[in-house]
Amino acid sequence: WRFFYNKQTDDYFTEAAEEDLYYLYDSDHVDIPAGLGDTQVPTFPYRYGRFRSSGNHFVKMKESTSVSNTTRYNGYGQSTCLAANHGVGFAAQAGAFSEYTFEKMGDPQPCYTDELFIEEAEAYFVAKVEAMIASGLEIGKEFTAVDVAQPDSSDFCKCKNCMNAIAAERANSAPVLYFTNIMADVMAEKFPGLWVSMLAYWGTSDPPKKTVPRDNVNVSYCFYNDINKLVCGNHSLNGEECSRHAVDGWGTTNYTYAEEFKEWCRISKRVTVWYYPLNWDFKSLTFSTIKTLRDDFKFFSEYGVHGFWICCADPSPWNDGKRESIDILAMYIIQRLLWNADMTDEEYRGMIDDYMYVLYGESGKLIYDYYEWIAASEADGCWPVMACYRSPAGAMNIEKTRDDFELCISMFEDAIKYAPSAKAEYAVRLASCAMYTRGLFASYYDRYLNGSETQKARYTEIWTYFRDLAVDTQYYFAGGYGASVGELKLSDFNIEENPGEMLARLSDSQSVVSEWWKWWEK
C-alpha cells in the first residue's frame, strides 16, 4: 500500500465495514509500468503507536487498519505497549507472587531486591516465554521482548537494600535496573535474541551513575509527569527552549527530561519512547499539540530511538463522531514523522494541507489557520502539558484569546460556507466546539460578569449557540461525560456559571490548582 501511495496516487484509504468510510480521489485509470520498484528505510524501525487508526470516522489515516495490526508492517515484534507496559503488575494480578499483590494504580511497588520476589518473577517470565514459543511464535518475528516493567505506581520500596542501591547509583531507578538486569541475564541464557523491557517512568526516569543496562535490555523512557518534575507543554522535548531550572513549584522544564533521556540513550543498546505531550484533561480547552512535533521527532531521530508508544487521550475510539480537535491532526502528523522525521518544510506543510483538505475540503485551510492561532494564544514560559497538573488558565494568554474570539468565530463561519458536504459541515461545526469553549472561558469575566449591556448580549448570543450545538452533537465536552454515554443535556448548562467551572464539574479528573477558572484572582 505504501508503495502505491508514494509512487502512484495521493489516495487515502482506511479499511472499514461501511463503504462510506473509504476516501479515494477520483481516478479513471492508474498506470503501473512494468519493473516499477521502490525501497525505503523509515526513520524509526518500530512505528506502531496507540490509536494508530483514529476512531473518528472523519479521519482517514494513510494506512489500512488491516496492515496496522501486523508485526511486519510496523517493524517485527510486539508493540512497545506490550514490550514495556507494567509487566510486573500484570504478573502480580496473574498470581505470580506469593507475597506481593498489585490490584490498582498507585498500590505499592514490590521490593526489587527481595530474593523470593526475584525468584518468582524469573519463574513466571520464563514460563510465559516458553508458552509463547510452544504456541508457534518465533523470537525475532512474532515477538521480540518480554515485559518486566514496573507497575503503575510511584510508591517504591524503602528497605535497606533498595536504599543502598539508590545511594550507590545516585538514582531512584537503581533497584528496578538491578532487577531488570537479572531478568535479562536469565533471558539471554535461555532465549538468545529476546529483549527485556523496563520503564524509565514515574520515579525511575533518572539514569544510574555506575551500572548500565544489559545489552538485551530495552529502556522505555517516558516524557511524562514524574514525582518531582513535569513535562513542559510549550516547548520541544529537546529542552533547548526551557529554562535549565524550573521556575514554578512543579519542576516544569523539558531540560531535565532531555538530559536524562540523552544519558539513557548513551548507556543503553535500545531505547523506546512513551510520548505523552498531547491534550489530556479538560480537553475542551484545547491547546496546541502540533507546534513542537517536528522538533521532537528530529530530536528522537538524532539519538537513535528505536520506536514509540504514543499515549494521548483525545482521538480515541469512544469519541467517534463526537469530537474534532487538533489532536486528530497531531496523530496523523506523528504517523508520518515516524516514517520520515527529516521531511523538508515544503513536504511537511504540503502533508498537512493535503490532510486538512481530505477532512474538510477548502474549509481545512481555515481550520488549520485556527490551529496555528492556538499556538499564538498560549502563555509564554514553561507550563505543564497535562491540565490536571496546572491551571489551564495559566497556559493561556487570556487577553489575546478574549480579544480574538470574534476573529476565531469568523474563521469557522467561513469554514462552514466552504464545507463541500453535509458530513464535512458537521465536522467543521464539531471542531468549532473547542474554539467556543476556549473563547467563552476567556470572555466570561470581562464580557459577561463585568461587561457592558452590548457585551453581555453578545456573550449570551454566542453562549446560547454553543450550548445548543454541544447538546445537538452530543459533543464530548469533558472526559468521562457527555458524548461517550449520551448524557450532555440542556440542564447541564447555566449561563451564570464560568465555562471553566462547568468543565471541571463535568470532568472525572481535577486540577491540582483549586478553582483555576477564577484566573482573575490568581
Report the location of each language-model feature.
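Feature activates predominantly on carbohydrate-active enzymes
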Residues: 1-178, 188, 262-286
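Structural preference for beta-strand elements that scaffold enzyme active sites
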Residues: 48, 143-147, 195-197, 216-220, ...
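Acidic, His- and aromatic-enriched active-site or binding-groove loops in soluble protein domains
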Residues: 166-186, 214-233, 300, 333-343
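Aromatic-lined carbohydrate-recognition surfaces of secreted/lumenal glycan-active proteins
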Residues: 180-206, 271-280, 308-313
